[in-house]
């Protein structure tokens, strides 16, 4: 039962209506009424506002006259807010009798414009307000939409209406319809059919909706109109409007008027190829459309492309105003304007997708200049009568010229030259008849079908029509005259060449079209293609991001091809790079023209390629006014497009950028794009697919058991003969090549295959093969050479460090190396397994430990062993005293690492880069820490970038960097124990020669407390001692030889000066006695010995050449080489320093541990507190009062 009504103020309060965007059926009351309601503690949910006003009464028929005005009422709820606007002057509203108050003293009631339109109020209307504080309540409401369009909108937003109806409507009435707001751009009108209990609104004419009320919506479907034959016609349009919208009248225009359709130029995959062979110039329509009165019984129709005035090209001043005109120059070829209306045969389209599309044959599309275009608006109507049979006896064909003809060629009519050949007139006519009468190409020959005056003929190679031509009907004075060539006898003549002058439909404001890719050319992005296609077909826009070489343009080409072939979208590509340097007004006009063109050819997908080149992101310390202006113009154009285009999926946007950060923030944050799809670098399986596609696809084993043959398209042949066949070695696994190319983009892989193929060609040329048809075998070594020195596009300009360290060079640290492998190598090696892992992978590690324990060496070795790029950072590289410079260095550093991913970013001496905040007088390190916290945020994660930090004082690092999500795990590089020291010595001894009798365990026992760097110093010092011993022994040999002893160097006395067995270590000048001098070697003696050695080398080369000439070169060279190698090995074995126990003892005496015992204990306590935990004692926060103490900035 309805409760008894309790009114607020009993008198009506005059007010003026003010329209505002409330988006509900509630009103804002004047401040005077609000004060009364607030003082009485009345809830806003219990208030119903009654608005009443007077309007002129409608005229009545008959002698009786009614009242001059009538009263209307509207009921609404209260928002709980007062009006903010001042009242306006009344416009066209009646005034209340006896009211003497001025407008300035009257309040303003604010109401939404859509709701006001439904109830009949306008801006400035004068109303009376009556408040109902305790109105009757209803718990069940039956509503129905006003129109079928309202029902369709409500059905589309049923869930939103269910959740938000009570927040928009509070009072219901039978007196006027109500408005519901279902989306930012759509509203629907409803009316109340019945309420329960039925007597709730009977006494007052309105009721309040209970909080738990049930709302029942009755559907309202469209009424199908019946044709005159009594059958129902589909709701789809038989004669579509300019934008391809459906018409309610399914019978089509009557009386033979024009009918409009949306064109699909053939060939098209939705069209059967067999049907296309039925005619040369013809159009295809659904059989149901052929039954409408305008087209019933028509065999031929006139076809015209409708061009809107706003998109028409500017008129050509060189052309005459009439249809046939010429140039002012007597020597220039004649210009004939083609006909805009062409008569074509009308045929049924059995598998038509709907009733609004029309298929245009290939030749007709070429004549109308809409070849390979979807979306043009075509007007067709029944063709008028043919020309009388006696009026036309000649058909003249005027070929198009490739260029301007000379005067002699223009005057010479007996011999004409086309396509590089001289054609006699009779021969040319016969050739034209032959090519235009072929039935195998177009199904029906051109000359046997409908021939329209000034019909454009296609370009036919190896004929006088090599550039196309135009057909003229001699004696035709009727505009758009035509004849049926198969029913007439006429004389075919070939006229002189003319200059082409064809009207162009503005199909694209950019001359650069998207690349046309063959089927299956792009691989590994099926998910992105399906996602983008589904989103675009649902009237949402997509932003495609990806680095250079990721295949954005190729992917866009595939997506637009799908939309064009399967969903009949018109594609409008715009290359933004071409407009990047244009004037702002030119860019704005380009946007306007693109939007207008897209609306005309809708549904349309507008492709903005390289949008970040036109609208880059705003940067610091630079003027970004131009970018912001263009971004605002772009956003306004898109918003105007969305608000003006009706119907789902009319115009959508597909844009490509390198990253969402590279484009202006107004574009990404302006609700322009519904979805952002990122093209990342392909994984290992994806790279394998790209490599297979690049080499032509793997095939089964062919005739050769060792190779699998692949025929590649257009390979660079070694000769001018047949193209060679590229063969892939059977043992070559492209998966291994994919594992070596981590981080490569598809474009990089394509270039890599080209480099490998070039290496194979070079190898084949160097092999001296005379077989012109020899197959090229692409092997692993070709890819190894191609990868060597190759820098992917994403890494060009990125400074990377290289390290020669490997696992074998590192001893000890077994557990630490294991964790590093798990963190860095396993996600790359076992990518499919980790892709399904639900846990977040570690991306940051802290290496801490005693100085000299191998932290830096471990970090440099892990990058090379795991196949990752390596960037090393020291403190001074990023610290800068200027405000903002250090933060920019950190940002640039992480951007470099992201560009080089997978990459290891190594911070050495991390405690100097990121100390605890609050203890820096300049604040530089504090800002660096804040920036690093932002870059290493655990919520976002670092994709492909691993952070390694090394320090010996982890207690000095800011604790925020050590939390999970940043530096997830800390690894201790402890002092080596006995086993670790043996392992370290074993790794170091690989590059040195130690006496076999010395055991590494003995050295390890004597080096307790030594770090890895100390052990390296011990061995290197011992190696230096061994080198000194070798040098001393050689000096002793030289000294003994100089004293006449038998040393290593001696000369055979019987051989003389011309025969040299070997060169001695010391050969001084001979004195008068003929004995070698024992004086110390001077610069002169050294020069003489060098000259003697050079002479001996020249004699050896001459002897070698002499033996080669004698025909015994190979054997002699081999014997000499073996003797030389043997002598070098013996000499090397004799001179190589060997570390013995004496050298090690000497080294141990001079080498001490780099870490003192006290320092080692102190560091042990620090590391123990870092692992176990710190005490709860915290500083008081007061600044230090000591002399020289630093005060905190926090």
Curated annotation (Swiss-Prot):
Per the record, the major location class is cytoplasm
PROSITE patterns xrefs = AAA
Q: Which reaction does it catalyse?
A: ATP + H2O = ADP + phosphate + H(+)
Ranges of Basic residues composition bias in the record:
221-234
- SMART domains documented for this protein: AAA
| CDD domains assigned | RecA-like_PEX1_r2
Q: Identify the Pfam families for this entry.
A: AAA, AAA_lid_3, PEX-1N
Q: Which family does it belong to?
A: Belongs to the AAA ATPase family.
Subunit field text? Interacts with PEX6; forming the PEX1-PEX6 AAA ATPase complex, which is composed of a heterohexamer formed by a trimer of PEX1-PEX6 dimers.
Kindly provide the name given to this protein in its UniProt entry: Peroxisomal ATPase PEX1
């Amino acid at each position: 039962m309805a409760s008894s009504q309790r009114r607020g103020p009993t008198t009506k309060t005059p007010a003026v209506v003010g329209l505002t965007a409330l988006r509900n059926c509630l009103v804002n009351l004047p401040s005077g009424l609000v004060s009364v309601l607030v003082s009485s503690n009345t809830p806003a949910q219990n208030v119903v506002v009654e608005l009443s006003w007077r309007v002129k009464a409608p005229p009545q028929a008959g002698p009786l006259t009614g009242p001059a005005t009538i009263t209307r009422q509207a009921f609404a709820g209260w928002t709980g807010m007062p009006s903010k606007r001042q009242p306006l002057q009344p416009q066209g509203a009646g005034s209340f009798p006896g009211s003497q108050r001025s407008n300035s003293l009257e309040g303003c009631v604010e109401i939404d414009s859509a709701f006001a339109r439904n109830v009949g109020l306008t801006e400035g209307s004068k109303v009376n307000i009556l408040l109902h504080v305790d109105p009757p309540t209803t718990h069940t409401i039956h509503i129905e939409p006003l129109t079928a369009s309202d029902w369709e909108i409500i059905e589309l937003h049923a869930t939103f209406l269910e959740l938000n109806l009570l927040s928009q409507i509070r009072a219901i009435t039978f007196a006027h319809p109500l408005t519901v707001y279902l989306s930012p751009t759509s509203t629907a009108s409803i009316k109340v059919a019945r309420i329960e209990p039925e007597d709730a609104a009977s006494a007052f004419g309105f009721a309040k909706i209970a909080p738990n009320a049930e709302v029942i919506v009755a559907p309202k479907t469209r009424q199908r109109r019946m044709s005159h034959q009594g059958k129902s016609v589909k709701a789809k349009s038989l004669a579509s409007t300019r934008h391809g919208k459906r018409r309610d009248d399914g019978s089509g225009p009557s009386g033979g008027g024009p009918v409009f359709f949306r064109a699909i130029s053939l060939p098209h995959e939705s069209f059967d190829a067999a049907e296309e062979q039925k005619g040369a110039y013809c159009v295809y329509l659904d059989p149901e459309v052929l039954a409408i009165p305008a087209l019933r019984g028509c065999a031929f129709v006139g076809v015209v492309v409708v061009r809107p005035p706003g998109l028409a090209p500017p008129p050509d001043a060189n052309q005459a105003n009439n249809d046939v005109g010429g140039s002012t120059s007597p020597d220039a070829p004649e210009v004939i304007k083609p006909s805009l209306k062409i008569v074509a045969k009308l045929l049924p389209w059995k598998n038509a997708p709907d009733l609004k599309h029309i298929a245009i044959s290939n030749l007709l599309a070429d004549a109308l200049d809409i070849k390979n275009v979807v979306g043009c608006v075509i007007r067709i109507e029944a063709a008028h009568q043919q020309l009388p049979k006696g009026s036309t006896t000649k058909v003249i064909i005027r070929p198009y010229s490739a260029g301007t003809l000379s005067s002699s060629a223009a005057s010479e009519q007996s011999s004409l030259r086309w396509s590089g050949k001289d054609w006699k007139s009779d021969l040319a006519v016969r050739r034209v008849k032959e090519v235009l009468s072929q039935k195998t190409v177009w199904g029906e020959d051109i000359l046997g079908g409908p021939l329209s005056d000034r019909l454009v003929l296609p370009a036919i190679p190896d004929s006088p029509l090599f550039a196309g031509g135009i057909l003229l009907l001699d004696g035709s004075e009727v505009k758009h005259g035509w004849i049926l060539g198969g029913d007439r006898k006429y004389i075919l003549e070939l006229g002189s060449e003319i200059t082409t002058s064809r009207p162009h439909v503005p199909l694209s404001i950019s001359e650069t079209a998207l690349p046309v890719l063959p089927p299956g050319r792009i691989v590994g992005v099926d998910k992105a293609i399906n996602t983008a296609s589904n989103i675009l077909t649902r009237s949402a826009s997509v932003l495609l991001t990806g680095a250079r070489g990721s295949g954005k343009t190729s992917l866009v080409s595939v997506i637009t091809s799908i939309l064009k072939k399967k969903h009949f979208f018109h594609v409008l590509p715009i290359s933004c790079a071409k407009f990047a340097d244009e004037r702002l007004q030119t860019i704005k006009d380009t946007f306007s023209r693109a939007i207008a063109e897209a609306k005309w050819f809708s549904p349309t997908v507008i492709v903005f390629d390289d949008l970040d080149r036109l609208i880059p992101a705003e940067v610091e310390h630079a003027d970004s006014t131009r970018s912001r202006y263009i971004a605002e113009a772009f956003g306004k154009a898109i918003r105007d497009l969305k608000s003006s285009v009706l119907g789902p999926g009319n115009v959508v946007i597909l844009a490509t950028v390198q990253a969402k950060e590279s484009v202006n923030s107004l574009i990404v944050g302006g609700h322009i794009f519904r979805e952002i799809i990122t093209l990342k670098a392909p994984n290992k399986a994806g790279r394998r697919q790209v490599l297979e596609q690049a080499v032509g696809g793997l095939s089964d084993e062919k005739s050769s058991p060792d190779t699998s043959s692949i025929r590649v398209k257009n390979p660079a042949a070694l000769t001018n003969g047949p193209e060679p066949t590229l063969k892939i070695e059977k043992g070559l696994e492209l998966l291994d090549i994919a594992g070596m190319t981590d981080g490569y983009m598809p474009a990089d892989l394509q270039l890599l295959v080209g480099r490998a193929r070039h290496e194979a060609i070079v190898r084949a040329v160097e092999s001296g093969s005379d077989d012109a048809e020899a197959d090229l075998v692409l092997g692993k070594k070709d890819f190894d050479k191609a990868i060597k020195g190759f820098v992917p596009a994403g890494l060009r300009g990125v400074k990377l460090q290289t390290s020669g360290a490997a696992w074998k060079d590192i001893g000890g640290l077994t557990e630490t190396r294991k964790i590093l492998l798990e963190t860095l190598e396993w996600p790359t090696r076992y990518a499919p397994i980790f892709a399904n892992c639900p846990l977040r992978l570690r991306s940051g590690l802290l290496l801490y430990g005693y100085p000299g324990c191998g932290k830096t060496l471990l970090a440099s070795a892990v990058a090379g062993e795991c196949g990752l790029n390596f960037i090393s950072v020291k403190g001074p590289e990023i610290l800068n005293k200027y405000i903002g410079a250090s933060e920019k260095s950190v940002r640039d550093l992480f951007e470099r690492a992201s560009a080089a991913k997978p990459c290891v970013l190594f911070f050495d001496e991390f405690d100097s880069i990121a100390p605890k905040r609050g203890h820096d007088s300049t604040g530089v390190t504090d800002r660096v820490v804040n920036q690093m916290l932002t870059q290493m945020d655990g919520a976002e994660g670092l994709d492909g970038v691993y952070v390694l930090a090394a320090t010996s004082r982890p207690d000095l690092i800011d604790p925020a960097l050590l939390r999970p999500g940043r530096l997830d795990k800390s690894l201790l590089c402890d002092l080596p124990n006995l086993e670790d020291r043996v392992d370290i010595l074993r790794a170091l001894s690989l590059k040195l020669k130690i006496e076999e009798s010395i055991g590494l365990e003995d050295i390890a026992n004597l080096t307790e407390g030594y770090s890895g760097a100390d052990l390296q110093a011990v061995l290197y010092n011992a190696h230096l001692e061994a080198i000194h011993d070798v040098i001393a022994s050689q000096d002793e040999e030289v000294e003994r030889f100089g004293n006449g002893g038998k040393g290593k160097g001696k000369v055979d006395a019987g051989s003389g000066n011309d025969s040299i067995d070997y060169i001695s270590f010391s050969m001084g000048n001979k004195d008068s006695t003929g004995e070698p001098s024992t004086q110390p070697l001077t610069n002169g003696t050294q020069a003489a010995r060098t000259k003697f050695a050079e002479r001996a080398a020249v004699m050896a080369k001459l002897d070698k050449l002499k033996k080669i000439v004698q025909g015994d070169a190979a054997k002699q060279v081999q014997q000499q080489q073996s003797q030389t190698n043997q002598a070098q090995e013996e000499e090397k074995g004799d001179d190589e320093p060997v570390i013995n126990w004496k050298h090690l003892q000497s080294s141990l005496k001079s080498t001490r541990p780099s870490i003192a015992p006290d320092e080692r204990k102190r560091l042990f306590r620090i590391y123990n507190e870092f692992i176990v935990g710190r005490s709860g004692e915290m500083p008081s926060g007061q600044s230090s009062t000591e002399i020289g103490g630093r005060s905190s900035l926090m």
